[in-house]
Amino acid sequence: MKQHSLDILLRPRSIAFVGASDRPNSTGAAMLAMCLIDGFDGKIFSINPRLSTLNGRPCYADLRALPEVPDHVVIGVASRFVEVVVDQALELGIRAATIFASCYLDDDTSPRLPARIAAKASSAGMQICGANCMGFYTPSAGLRVASVASPDGLQKGGIAWIAQSGSAFGALSHNDRRLGFNLVVSTGMELVTTVADYMEWALHQPETRVVGLFIETIRNAAGFIAALEIARKREIPVVVLKVGRTLKSAQMAVSHTGAIAGNDAVYEAVFRAYGVHRVADMDEMAATLALFDTPRRPAPGQLGAIHDSGGERELLVDLAEDYGFRFAELASATCTALQEHLEPGLVAENPLDAFGTHNNLEDRFAALIATLVNDANVGLGVFLSNPRDGYAYAENYCSALIKAAQITDKPLALATNYSMADDRKIAIRLKEAGIPLLRGTRNALLATGHFMADREFRSRYSKLSEIAQPKNIVHEAVVSRWKARLADRAPLTEADGLTMLADFGLAAPGMATVTSLAELNAAINNLAFPTVLKTAEDYAHKSEVDGVRLNLTSADEAIEAYTEMAACLGPKVLVMEMVPAGFELSFGAIYDVDFGTVVIVSAGGVLIEFLNDKVAALAPLDCEAAKSLLSELRIARLLAGYRGKPAVDMDGLARQLAQFSQMVALLGDAITEIDINPVICGPDGAFAVDCLVLTKAGVK
């Protein structure tokens, strides 16, 4: 295989351990023991000026005393000694290092130690795992670089597990024998080598089937996007547990590793664009990785489930309904074939309760599983039970699954109804046969959902070579004019914002800004009643200051409303034609310096904060993507009409959203943030009736 720039870090031929020790339970002792536990056959050098030999090997005073220059130096000393070791390594031309220490010093100078090391190493082309990390494992090289002892028996497989949390790094690799890895990394502070770099290395390894990430932030956005693009093209799923969703946890991320968690909507948009599977916790992560680390992918169709319990079948059906999960409709021929293998009193259906008695259990279940899964409407099969090591029925079930796997090419999995079963031996046996074990009914359903969603993503984007780019929806002069206006420090009024929307092809009502009764009279002569009056003074939320008057049906009503509003809030007022009542949404966008412009759609009007129902996507969108985004709102079902209210014109609404996304993509960083709230939707279209714009200058 062609050499990769990270091979020197993750697959070195020789390693020096600075701080090696014979003291029990020390970092120096643990890192040597872990290096040997999986059979690493490269050269190992121990460095400790107080020892001449260690574990029967020579022990050297420092890096300069070594008989040859190693590929990689593992730095297992306290923070105050790290810089000296790094300087020696750079002097000798060592190109990779792992730093366990935090590199925080009480009496540090500016720039701080982490910044000094990062600058020196980057300049010299040195790769660094850490600082403040727990190391990494490369099972294919028989190598563990670690600061603490960990269990033996690490399973090899197709999972690359990359974690910014040291605890998360060990949670899966040290405790779960269902999972097999080809890379496990605790990235730490990422002084040089980032999550994106590890992803890129893993995606070029032939054994990688899935990449799992535990992240607080992304420090190399361009590299991350490039890695996601590689994953998309190679059809390697990426599963992410992104923490820092809430304000409190984002603040904790800063104190933990100095990571800025970032706007969660931006990450949600990036994940959506590249088909990244976002999970909520470690249990869902483990189940999803286990399912993706199989050689098979789901066929067209839905889930086929088989049980040895009627009651727990009902549990599955209840949970499936909670998550909107569908089971495959079986063909009549499949039901007939199933019935031949079922004992009296059992009904051929999906999900299938198949136990009856223990007679001929192994062969009967093998036939039932294969028959169910081979139905044309079934995409994958899951057998749910409560196996435990040493339980006779569990052995029968495992054998049945393995037999069934030999007569179907569709993926199979065993799921437990309880996540704490004693099933380590069963898990390993099934894994060797390419069948994952998923712990817990809920986790099994969630993982299966990701598995099937990945199929849909691949189907939709298999022919695309790149993420969508903005189109020239208006003349270039319009874009240039508005970029110039947005760069002006003069505040952009609501009327300016609505005019901008209209210039880019979005529907907005007729309007005029007035500062006197005379101007109001002139304006309403050119507008259709009913009208709306809104204060044009500097209030972000007009409804909170009684700055909106609706449904004014005559000139007299408009004059009366203007007089009252001008007296309380000031004479500058926006008069607009009133859009017929409809469903209220909000279109918004933010510009992120790392990932670009993100469109956010949510329930609108005064309910925007109350409902917290929003979805995000990278701009721009085409009409199909816009419609798909709208369908993911919790309130989407209401748009189809309810209780006598007419359905919204979804095609028209999607066109408006797509047009908006094209506009913000074309304007780029000229707009820091924009909020159109509400967008009033009905059977005759969608209209923007309020617009707030923030520019780079920080003025409205």
Where are these regions (language model features)?
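Catalytic-core regions of core metabolic enzymes
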Residues: M1-K700
